[in-house]
Amino acid sequence: PGLSVSMATALLVSITYTWDHSDALAMIMGVYVVGVFSGAVSAILINIPGTPSSITTTFDGYPMAKRGEGERALKIGIFSSFIGGLISLICLWLFTPLLSAAALKFSAVEKFLIILFALTVIAALSKGQMLRGVFAGFLGVLTSLIGMFSVNNAYRMVPAMFKSKMQDGFQLLPVLIGLFAIAQIFEEAEEGMRFKIDKVDGEMDGKSTFSFKDFKGQGINLVRSSLIGTFMGVLPGVGGSAASILAYAQAKNFSKHPELLGTGVAEGLVASETSNNGLTGGALIPLLSLGIPGDSTTAVLISAFMLQGVSEYDLEKFYPEKLEGTMPTIEEWEAKLGGSIEHE
């Protein structure tokens, strides 16, 4: 927690400067894809999301870890992330021109409506605790208003003594880590004072281990969450947290047992992690076709492409031979699973 994917990507840009372009792009893309999943590790094991998009992973991942199923939860998350990334890459290869054209038509009004819809999802996820959910949403919106207004450079709700340090308001990642970490510390401290901690037997009984039966009936959930993540990734500035929340809400709406989500079931974990990695291919679509980064990490990727001699505008059209370096790596993974995807 606290170290982002964009930090790792920025470090690799300087390290891979002298590498062959295929090796450099494959290395950077690998860190980008895997880094998105890595936020789930702390989210599952200690209930602190490593990335903003891992918020919903804590809903079911941590309850599974508390039952002694942490390893199973991590393996479900890894496989779900792989499927989500694979589907988003298929969309990247097949629908880049179409999705890029649609993304360009999204103005500030449409983006506002998407964020507003994401906020209304709070109501759907707060059944039984509506007042608490609405208050949390209102507090989040109020906090986001703090900082400098870009239209007229006026400060909003910023004390005079903090103007130099709060021009951009509160950064999302430190706020999330602080809120989740502090809450978890108080919870652990309270439980430690009330209960005696017994020694836990590390042996597995076989019921808590991972198997592909965990994905029985999850096909629609996998595809739906991947497509949600891909589409949200195409829209610059929307973010992975909105994608994971929307995917989780849809999984809950279409679930046969929605009351179980949030108690530690694979269905919620699959929706969250699939949409997270579905975001990676979607964020690359406007980058490769229009030179517009979909998120902060793809903004760093533009620098990597330029250092490798690739133009930052209309990348796929003018430099397909250099971008080939990102494709064979994925095909090697596909071949290990017994299939491959052809591309020009």
Feature names for model-found ranges:
Residues 1-9, 23, 44-57, 106-111, ...:
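Short, non-helical or kinked segments that cap or interrupt transmembrane helices
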Residues 1-24, 97-100, 104, 159-265:
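Helix-loop-helix hairpins and the membrane-proximal interhelical loops
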Residues 11, 45-73, 98, 201-203, ...:
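Flexible loop linkers connecting adjacent transmembrane helices
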Residues 12, 16, 26, 30-42, ...:
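Alpha-helical transmembrane segments in multi-pass membrane proteins
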Residues 74-193, 307-324, 328-335, 344:
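Membrane-embedded alpha-helical modules
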